[in-house]
Amino acid sequence: MRRNSERPVRITEVCLRDGSHVMKHQFTEEQVRFVTRALDEAGMHYIEVSHGDGLGGSTLQYGKSLVNEMKLIEAAVDECKQAQIAVLLIPGIGTIHELKQAANIGAKLVRVATHVTEADVSAQHIQFARELGMEVCGFLMMAHSASVEKLVEQGKLMESYGAEAVYVTDSAGALLPHEVRERIRALRQSLNIEIGFHGHNNLSVAVANTITAIEEGATRIDGSVRCLGAGAGNAQTEVLLAVLDRMGYKLDIDLYKMMDVAEEVVAPLLPVPQEIQKGSLVMGYAGVYSSFLLHAERAAQRFNVDARDILIELGKRKVVGGQEDMILDVAAELAKIKMEV
């Protein structure tokens, strides 16, 4: 698992959480079991399972789940012989009640996610997760939208609450490699805990960004097999593993088996092939939260406007995750302007 004397790099596979956005939160228990079993057999370290917006996300605003996420988490735990199940929790969407439920049925890791400038809202959840005996990471979302200094300040807060790692989370897929480098380096120099990176492929640099993060000392990284994640997906896990192997990193994950998981297990589940289309490209370009894509496309159809215009305007307004209601407001405003022209 180690390269020379470096700390081990650990991967969290997010296709069953981030990929829930692509699936419109309609994963079945059988699908979760099938994917989890295959990932576990391949040697994956962590497998994240929950609604796309984390615990408690099954709402009208974020999208209703077909199956209660606790049943999906329980099914995933049941299929694992060596991998550990992770969950995402966004304070204000998920609660400590749901976190306790997830822990009780076997989830071992929680990533507590906040907007990059709002780490203070994570204190209660991080501390409670530690009391539950869970492994706890902080997840600073929309990391492109804050200065490096602000990112470090917020990372230090999460560290002080008890987080065992802090992630630079490129929710919009907007960061370029040099921007990842300066952020990871600054956190590595300022914090005494592990640093992680979560990328999105909206500008086709998710794998490059992840490699850059590792080169700067990140030891926790995310991938989504077959790029099954919001927007254009995340760093494609099987590709990432191949690159890391070429670079000399040995992660004890079977590359051939991960290729097979991508081709034979996950690909048939995809509603459409994961590729960088104009909507996801605009999200990376404008710096918009990746899970906004489907909401923007639906709003564009409803109000007869261009989804790209909606996303660009959301980027200008610096709308963040949790403000999905703004998408309809922007679409309505654009439609009104269109009628007046």
Curated annotation (Swiss-Prot):
Record keywords, A-Z: Aromatic hydrocarbons catabolism, Lyase, Manganese, Metal-binding
Positions bound to Mn(2+): 18, 198, 200
Binding site for substrate: 17-18, 171, 198, 289
Pfam families linked: DmpG_comm, HMGL-like
Active site, per annotation: 21
Gene Ontology molecular function: any one: manganese ion binding
Domain Pyruvate carboxyltransferase: start-end pairs: 9-259
Record-marked site positions (Transition state stabilizer): 17
GO terms classed as biological process: catabolic process; L-leucine biosynthetic process
Reaction(s) catalysed (UniProt annotation): (S)-4-hydroxy-2-oxopentanoate = acetaldehyde + pyruvate
Enzyme Commission code: 4.1.3.39
InterPro entries (UniProt xref): 2-IPM_HCS-like, 4OH_2_O-val_aldolase, Aldolase_TIM, DmpG_comm, DRE_TIM_HOA, PYR_CT
SUPFAM superfamilies: Aldolase, post-HMGL domain-like
PANTHER family for this protein: 2-ISOPROPYLMALATE SYNTHASE 1, CHLOROPLASTIC-RELATED (PTHR10277:SF9), HOMOCITRATE SYNTHASE-RELATED (PTHR10277)
Family indicated by similarity: Belongs to the 4-hydroxy-2-oxovalerate aldolase family.
Record HAMAP family: HOA
Protein name (record): 4-hydroxy-2-oxovalerate aldolase
Organism name: Bacillus cereus (strain 03BB102)
The encoding gene: dmpG
